[in-house]
């Protein structure tokens, strides 16, 4: 979740677009390269014609907070307003989704003006009460669907402030529009679980489990704040919610299970996403 890091940290993970002067270069053969006649050639990657992942990630990142950069990226590559990024475990987010759960009306309205498909979540944040009612009338129960990072529909309306007050009042009358409380997590369980879990020899084959939750304090996005942070080395933090018996689900992926059990080798972690994805054992403390 992006509130978990500073703007500087976010931008460290993002990269800049190709120079605009390079955009008019023609591709002559897939996997080939234009002769360097003007000293400004580009390679065609294996992912072409899909959008460059580094640009998608940056666009979704800056759509939380930086309107100017959003405009620069969309001016250079207009299709980025419809991009989507997976922060982990299938927690997909679009630029409009990012702006919506942050309550960033200016960015949301700009993205919509550039062709980003509107959503129920953007309508809730923008205070579009009749649109929200129409969707719920056509699809009863859809208020239970969560947005990026498991943020509820009602929370999106809360982030819209006074302009979305009518939507907030309406959603409060509907069952399931807000998040359910997670299972309590005892302090002794937290202490028992924290540490670094290893599932291979590579430097990125480690997961840090931490309990620094100050980033979620006083935030309207979550009615019930996450209880732990799960971070694979080199990736963004995934907030965890407790289901009971030391079993959790990561934000944006309620069907995934992250379980902790005591074993002969120490504390074990397993990740199940329809099938067992990985098992890891916690590093032993140096004596």
Give the residues covered by each predicted segment.
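Conserved ankyrin/ankyrin-like repeat signature
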Residues: 69, 106-107, 131, 163-167
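Peripheral terminal and inter-domain segments
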Residues: 177-287
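C-terminal segment of N-terminal export signals and the immediately downstream linker at the start
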Residues: 24-61, 66
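Ankyrin-repeat boundary/"N-cap" motif
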Residues: 49-61, 82-98, 117-124, 145-159
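Ankyrin-repeat C-terminal turn/loop position
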Residues: 78-79, 115-116, 140-141, 176
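N-terminal secretory signal peptides and thylakoid transit peptides that target proteins
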Residues: 1-18
């Amino acid at each position: 979740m992006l509130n978990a890091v500073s703007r500087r940290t976010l931008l460290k993970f993002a990269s800049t677009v190709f120079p605009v002067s390079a955009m008019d270069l023609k591709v002559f053969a897939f996997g080939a390269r234009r002769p360097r006649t003007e000293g400004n050639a580009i390679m065609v990657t294996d992912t072409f014609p899909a959008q460059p992942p580094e640009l998608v990630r940056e666009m979704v990142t800056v759509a939380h907070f930086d309107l100017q950069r959003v405009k620069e990226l969309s001016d250079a590559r207009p299709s980025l307003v419809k991009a989507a990024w997976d922060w982990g475990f299938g927690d997909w987010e679009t630029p409009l989704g990012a702006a919506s759960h942050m309550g960033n009306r200016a960015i949301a309205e700009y993205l919509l003006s550039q062709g980003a498909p509107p959503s129920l979540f953007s309508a809730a944040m923008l205070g579009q009460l009749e649109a929200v009612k129409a969707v719920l009338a056509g699809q009863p129960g859809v208020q239970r669907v969560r947005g990026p990072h498991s943020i509820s529909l009602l929370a999106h309306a809360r982030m819209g402030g006074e302009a979305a007050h009518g939507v907030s009042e309406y959603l409060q009358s509907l069952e399931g529009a807000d998040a359910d409380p997670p299972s309590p997590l005892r302090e002794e369980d937290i202490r028992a679980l924290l540490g670094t879990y290893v599932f291979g020899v590579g430097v990125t084959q480690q997961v840090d489990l931490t309990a620094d939750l100050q980033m979620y304090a006083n935030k309207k996005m979550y009615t019930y704040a996450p209880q732990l942070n799960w971070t694979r080395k080199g990736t963004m933090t995934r907030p965890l919610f407790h289901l009971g018996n030391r079993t959790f689900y990561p934000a944006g992926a309620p069907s995934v299970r992250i379980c902790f059990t005591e074993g002969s080798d120490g504390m074990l972690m397993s990740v199940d996403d329809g099938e067992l994805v990985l098992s890891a054992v916690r590093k032993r403390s140096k004596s």
